[in-house]
Amino acid sequence: MTGMFDVSKKIDTFRTATARAVLRISSTTIHHIDNGNSPKGNIIEAAKISGTMAAKKTYDLIPYCHPIPIDYVKVDVSIGENQIEILVQVKSIWKTGVEMEALTAASIASLTIYDMLKPIDAYLSIESIRLIKKKGGINDFKESSWSKIKAAVLVASDTRSKQEDESGRIIIEKLKGIGCDIVEYVVIPDNKATIISELKRFSDDLKVDIVITTGGTGVGPHDFTPEATKEILEKELLGVAETIRAHGQRRTPLSMLSRGVVGLRGNTVIINLPGSVNAVLESLDCIFPGILHIFKMLQGHRHK
């Protein structure tokens, strides 16, 4: 299917991109510019204004670009020997990159200068428009390999259903997709003592690196997963649990009812996810791959 990419599952990250455009001009034209004799006025100010406007209007010009909240646009114009260089930097905190905004700004700024100088320079040309660099997005947080990470999945449910099976399968597929070794997958009753026993077995006996539970995080009479998890945790990771709920709350008002907790027992990361398929999908999109950086921290490495 063609058209816009669906970025609704992505999280907001800091994005930046820099684009460069170069116009080739004659030495005579440079003389006119230096003496303020450009027939249509100040080319530098016009390029800065048009480039800034173009960055903010990219989605109107390029049909499949997303409307992006632009936080910063900077257009620099420098005149050298027989050339004019335009350098554009764009910044945003959003789900998708700002490369097209930077390139569009550089393009329109160069076309503006072309329009203003063409009456006096028959050999004027736009030599190049290129993306110089870009940064941002979830890929910046991916590590080279997670093949040594051992994982376990625990489904807490009084009555095993297709939904629980599907939620567990989704978690397994996600973990396998990032190279984790699935040590065990269990479905157990939503019973506090049983959950505690299994979590201890995973962390203390099997020494798995990450345990993801699904189910039992609500406010029902048989929802005990958070209580069981808290009882055996040595350190809570409040920020992760808050991030999961905040991500979900932007998609459904029911996310605030989840009581899932996240934390460490020894070097084992334990993550409570809700039981519904949609909640599991949204939560996994939210925390991976960023959560995996914790294993470097546990080894004594600093943040990037």
Predicted regions and their residues:
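Short, well-ordered alpha-helices that flank and scaffold nucleotide-derived cofactor binding pockets
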Residues: 173, 177, 246, 289
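Active-site phosphate-binding and catalytic loops of NTP-dependent enzymes
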Residues: 60-66, 249
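Short amphipathic alpha-helical segments
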Residues: 165-167, 223-227, 284-285
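C-terminal binding/interaction regions
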Residues: 1-44, 49-60, 71-72, 76-150, ...
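Glycine-rich phosphate/diphosphate-binding loop of Rossmann-like nucleotide-binding domains
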Residues: 115-122, 139-190, 194-196
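Short, acidic/small-residue loops that bind anionic groups at enzyme active sites
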Residues: 230-256, 294-301
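N-terminal small/polar loop signature for handling phosphorylated ligands or for N-terminal nucleophile
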Residues: 172-236
